[in-house]
Design a protein with these regions (language model features):
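Short low-complexity stretches enriched in small and charged residues
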Residues: 1-3, 74-82, 227-230
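N-terminal pre-domain segments of enzymes
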Residues: 1-26
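Juxtacatalytic substrate-recognition/specificity segment
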Residues: 14-15, 32, 36-196, 295-301
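General structural signal for secondary-structure boundaries
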Residues: 16, 23-24, 47-49, 88, ...
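Short hydrophobic/aromatic segments of transmembrane alpha-helices and their interfaces
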Residues: 24-26, 169, 264-265
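Feature detects long, helix-prone N-terminal segments enriched in hydrophobes
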Residues: 26-27, 64
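Acidic/His/Gly-enriched intrinsically disordered linker/tail segments
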Residues: 142-163, 194-326
């Protein structure tokens, strides 16, 4: 158990003075697997899932299984089908690895609460939207069927509650994994003090898109025209748009923008990709704006770290996009 990074299994204490037994009274006893690791508490009723068909996604999964196998020889190094317990251990490993990567990127020292969170982070993985909706209504006072982050202000717990069911039915394992990465990186930024929305979204998309899938984790505004067949081909989209200055959101405007729309999300992703070409500089920029996301702070951090004024940043980024995306 310890070699897998597991601190313990259920029952567990949860948020707002509740326990996992209270959650099971609502969702049904024995329907959720509970587990605790160094930085997280998990609940999952994910069912069986097939391994990805995409070659890159299969290689990613095989690498994850090999890392788990090194910790516990009972874990297979490859699998065509993932059972509920294996999926839970995979997500626990994914969460801890992403946590450490974000903490390193943010320049946080090693320790029990590297990001400054008051409590362990909570992650709930539901197979169906109906279970997610019941949980949100009963324990968060919210009406939703969508994967979301939530803060329990009474006890200081931050949580990610997600479902493997989309509007068109069950999602495959790689799509669910990609969405998990997107929301997890945002939760970590919340725990570290919060940051500008474009940076939260952009960093989340960078990590999300490392897992091949055709899902997009953003909405399309009514005033935007997006071809559904190619909506996930962000490299092609941004390469075309940066040719025209009027089609990109200037950095100074992006710093405080709250409704990014589809193309704003694409641009946020591409800006973070450009900034991550120098990870040391990006880490310095991230550390400078965490908890201090004002426009003035972002502009000052850009000048101090990248030695660029906003207009020069826009020009350098557009030139890089035109050269590197196809």
């Amino acid at each position: 158990m310890a070699r897998l990074g597991v601190v313990g299994y259920g029952p567990l204490a949860w948020a707002d003075g509740k326990r996992t037994a209270d959650i099971e009274k609502v969702l049904g006893e024995g329907r959720v697997l509970w587990m605790e690791t160094e930085h997280f508490k998990f609940g999952s009723n994910f069912g069986f899932a097939r391994a990805p068909k995409d070659p890159k996604a299969r290689r990613l999964l095989k690498g994850e299984l090999k890392r788990l196998h090194k910790k516990c020889k009972k874990v297979p190094t490859s699998a065509s089908k993932l059972d509920p317990w294996l999926r839970l251990h995979l997500y626990a490993q994914r969460a801890e690895e992403l946590y450490d990567e974000f903490a390193d990127l943010a320049g946080r020292p090693h320790g029990e609460r590297r990001l400054g969170e008051k409590q362990k982070l909570l992650i709930l993985l539901f197979e169906k939207k109906s279970d997610l909706a019941r949980y949100f209504k009963s324990f968060c006072g919210r009406e939703t069927q969508q994967t979301q982050r939530h803060t329990h202000y009474g006890t200081g717990h931050r949580s990610l509650v997600m479902t493997a069911e989309g509007d068109d039915g069950p999602r495959d394992s790689e799509t669910t994994h990609a969405q998990f990465r997107y929301f997890a990186m945002q939760m970590f930024m919340d725990a570290a003090g919060g940051g500008p929305l474009w940076l939260q979204y952009g960093l989340g998309h960078v990590y999300e898109r490392e897992v091949p899938c055709n899902m997009i984790n953003c909405g399309v505004r009514a005033d935007e025209s997006v071809d559904l067949a190619s909506q996930y081909e962000w490299g092609k989209k941004i390469r075309k748009r940066v040719k025209f200055e009027g089609l990109v959101v200037p950095f100074e405007e992006l710093t405080t923008k709250t409704d990014l729309g589809y193309y704003g999300h694409v641009q946020a992703w591409a800006r973070v990709e450009w900034m991550l070409q120098d990870r040391a500089r990006f880490a310095e920029f991230l550390g400078a704006v965490l908890g201090k996301p004002s426009r003035a702070r972002q502009v000052a951090a850009l000048a101090g770290v990248y030695e660029l004024e906003p207009a020069a940043f826009d020009a350098a980024w557009r030139k890089w996009c035109a050269k590197n995306y196809r």
